[in-house]
Amino acid sequence: MQDELFETEKIPPKNTKNTKNAPKKSFEEHVHSLERAIDRLNDPNLSLKDGMDLYKTAMQELFLAQKLLENAYLEHEKLQTPDQKA
């Protein structure tokens, strides 16, 4: 269960409806994907359509990374106050 707090579902291929069986991505994997997207967005030869698609993907990676970071913070806070029930 501890590992589940720090992983999100990897983005499934389009047209995939079952996300419960999707593999999980760690915070670091989200950040790495975001870094790669930023590098690719800096390519002057990137088309507008590809740039917009990449931007959407990057924003999703950022959102998921932030969610994992928030979960880690909440878990840390919970560990700092062990006398309170979760």
From Swiss-Prot:
Organism superkingdom: Bacteria
GO molecular function: exodeoxyribonuclease VII activity
EC numbers on record: 3.1.11.6
Keyword vocabulary terms for this entry: Cytoplasm, Exonuclease, Hydrolase, Nuclease
Keyword Calcium annotated: no
Catalytic class of the enzyme: hydrolase
Pfam family, one: Exonuc_VII_S
Catalytic activity: Exonucleolytic cleavage in either 5'- to 3'- or 3'- to 5'-direction to yield nucleoside 5'-phosphates
Gene Ontology BP annotations: DNA catabolic process
Subcellular location: Cytoplasm
Gene Ontology CC annotations of this record: cytoplasm; exodeoxyribonuclease VII complex
Region annotated Disordered, chain positions: 1-26
HAMAP family per the UniProt record, alphabetical: Exonuc_7_S
Similarity remark: Belongs to the XseB family.
Complexes and interactors: Heterooligomer composed of large and small subunits.
Task of the protein: Bidirectionally degrades single-stranded DNA into large acid-insoluble oligonucleotides, which are then degraded further into small acid-soluble oligonucleotides.
Protein name: Exodeoxyribonuclease 7 small subunit
Organism: Helicobacter pylori (strain ATCC 700392 / 26695) (Campylobacter pylori)
Gene that produces this protein: xseB
